[in-house]
């Protein structure tokens, strides 16, 4: 089975052609500078092709993608008919979507309804969907929402303690993000530990970071909120702060609310504390060379991650498994070690030699650790492909 996975941005479109059963990616690429001049970056194995192709809209980007996929020299299929379905990543499903779904007119209307919650991403995601419908009208399309996995949270976890009318009229509540990654890791961890009923905390740590408390495969709580700004501090995002900070800064420095939020999203986090970089590798190098601010940034990050693990362990009445995923979680051995050191009171013990390995799926805890600690490399595209295949096969 061939699933085409689409992740559409405002001026870009990423794609992969994948077998959902094996996870084998036969081709992948990026259409960039859509609406400007257009460029296609296509990769099959180690072979790369770059072409300048006019792409006034996402429709031309999809057409260029399909054309190169069936190209006699650079393609991997003979006909577009060999694509069984298309899976679209959609950022925000609001309170409309609790799971992935086959796209129809009603689904498109509901995604549009969620635009106020995802004003930057949802319109672009819709452009990708509508472009595929135009170019591939008979191929099933599936929407996979970044928020859907977290929709199993109970009200005590997702409701904000603000007047009810804002929830009822404007759907203001905790939603959470990185849901496709959290879902993949939860499902994969169940396979690794050999059972479906267990309690875990997953740490998706990268330039953007979020954590989730998961019980028996279902999300009970997550760190991000109405937007991805909440939770632990990130590469350039502040994470949790006192909401009154916004008013204080706006009043003192004459900023608009939008300018202040831009600062909190793009100029804060590790970049702000270190004064050097948002990249954890740069912070590690800086700390090793005696830069106290780089060391503080990393210490702050590990402290906040460990604090949330402790909070979620309390919320779940204990945990069986702790998982690390995404760029930092999979590769930054010092971050994993520091987080787990905080959790010694929970009986968490990791093997330094096992933890020294980067980017590999493996258990890094010791045999006598009371909590299994795993590194589980994420694969959001495979999760999208599997969701798409399951829905399309069920509809046959």
Task: Map each language-model feature to its residues.
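Short glycine-rich, Thr/Ser-proximal phosphate-binding strand/loop in the N-terminal lobe
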Residues: 3, 12-56, 225
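Glycine-rich beta-strand-to-loop/alpha-helix junction loops that act as flexible
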Residues: 8-9, 88-91, 205-207, 319, ...
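Short beta-strand-loop/turn "lid" adjacent to the catalytic site in phosphate-handling enzymes
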Residues: 69, 73-121, 142, 149-157
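Glycine-rich phosphate-binding loop of actin/hexokinase-like ATP-binding domains
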Residues: 149-252
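Catalytic phosphate/nucleotide-handling subdomain of diverse soluble enzymes
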Residues: 215, 220-256, 262, 326-357
